Amino acid sequence: MKKLAKRITGKEWGMILLTVLFTCFSVYLELEVPTYISEITELIGTPGTDMGALWSPAIKMIGLSLLAFLSSVTVGFFAARVAASYTTHLRSDIFHRVLDFSQTEIKRFSIPSLLTRTTNDITQIQMLFTMGLQVVTRGPIMAIWAIGKILGKSEYWLWAVVIAVIVNVLMTTVLMTLAFPKQSVIQKLTDKLNSITRESLTGIRVVRAYNAEDYQDQKFEEANAEVTRLNLFVNRLMAIMNPIMMAISSGLSLAIYWIGAYIINDASLTDRLPLFSDMVVFMSYAMQVVIGFLLMGALFIVLPRTLVSAGRINQVLDLHSSIENPSQPQTADSSIQGQVEFRDVTFRYSKNSEAVVEHVSFKAEAGQTVAFIGSTGSGKSTLVNLLPRFYDVSDGEILVDGVNVQDYDLEDLRNKVGYIPQKAVLFSGDVKGNLDFGKSPETPLSETAMWQALELAQSKSFIEDKEAGLNSEVPQGGTNFSGGQRQRLAIARALARKPEILIFDDSFSALDYKTDRILRQVLAEKTQSMTKLIVAQRISTIMDADLILVLDQGKVVGQGTHKELLATNEVYQEIAYSQLSKEELEHGK
């Protein structure tokens, strides 16, 4: 919590100070009320008291109560403002930190866990602020102030209050000790539950196709039952708190009246009325002490989970991306554009893991096409993901326009690259928003530029067929488009940026052969100045590449043109002849 407290802004500290001041004022007013109760009690017990004499203390008491009410409302207002303001920028900080994470950091937490930390854990912090500013300040202030008021009244009554406070503190300590370890487990199980739910929903068609509803239900029920069991354990512990506190409160009242009865019985007749008045006042103050601890007890119900949430949030905020901008970024010579060179590149996901790609070297001049082919898991996608620095190389270096990619400002480097991932990603909004996405030297795009990009990507026809055209709605994930249409829109988005380098990470896989062939022909004609790196499974997609790298278990086992590899490389031959006939391969059909 100390780390999170450092993120509170000056304005929020100001509102917190006002909250404390109004809380003190409210407590002061509430603690003044028993004084007038005592005065009214004495007046009632005094023979011959006129009814008019009661109005003055009664009106003052009502006035104090109204002021205390207004002060409490003000405290609630400021507490809500602070909680909302703080969690707004805390949520924003987490979101921006996650956006800066490389794939390594995202895999470390997992997407469901990051979602839980950004939503549920933040809500726990907001609840703590809302309750805490009203309870944490009010409880101790009221308890201490009330104890100060009753000091010197009667040591017997005072001992009753002290014993009640000690029992209260012991109970709270025991409950916190039992509940706190369970809260950490609950949060982890909540992550697991979210992961299972997300997995089931995203793969719902596969689940239904394999009649696996019962299997997924069982997985969910097991995780859900475990979360429920622990939540019940914690909630039952917390449920004990209120009855025990009520018992302490009732016991304290009984003790005060019992002790008071003995004291008043032993006093002279003239002293009995003042003693009774003192007992009424003491009783009011004692109840204020108990209420103070009741308020703090209410906070302890949410505190264990909030502390766990704070730790989980700090884990995200304390972790910095392994992909960092250089302190003194370099710029490339403007005379060189689109040149890519890999020099003995090796990559491992961690220092102790096996290399995913090893000793890869090649050079692509501006406008050339370099293709990568190999079996599943051979490292093709990982290799091209190193260029825009989604990961950093473990050994060797990658040069773009003669400059090491790690020496570029990240924004400048990624402005040079148009990236089309394996799974086409479309964002909710409209077609126009998906094409004019992010920052690049070309933004904001004109509609003419968008239509040109759509035409290049063979997407113009099906967008024109839509009534709203570029303003056509795109739901999350682009579910109103087919897989091939989504891929073509993703290609159009990259082309619209007019980058120096295009990376196609198996981006033709959902296209039919005819569209694939037409698209490749158009790209070859219209993007001659752009360097193209193509990861593909189909031989037909890469036959015309200037250079083809054959990968097997992360190593380059062949390098050359289609004809050269077809004549000399066994791995390439095996892939090629499994897809096309000898005539198609030799004549490039």
What are the residue ranges of the model-derived segments?
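Helix-loop-helix
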Residues: 50, 149-166, 233-312, 316-317
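Transmembrane helix-loop-helix hairpins at lipid-water interfaces of multipass membrane proteins
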Residues: 10, 14-74, 78, 151-156, ...
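Conserved catalytic Walker-motif region of ABC-type ATPase nucleotide-binding domains
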Residues: 98, 220, 313, 342-344
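ABC-type nucleotide-binding domain
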Residues: 333-589
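Juxtamembrane helix-loop junctions of ABC transporter transmembrane domains
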Residues: 21-22, 29-42, 64-111, 115, ...
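Transmembrane helices of ABC transporter permease
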Residues: 11, 15-28, 32, 130-186, ...
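An intracellular "coupling" helix at the cytosolic face of ABC transporter transmembrane type-1 domains
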Residues: 10-13, 100-104, 120-129, 133, ...
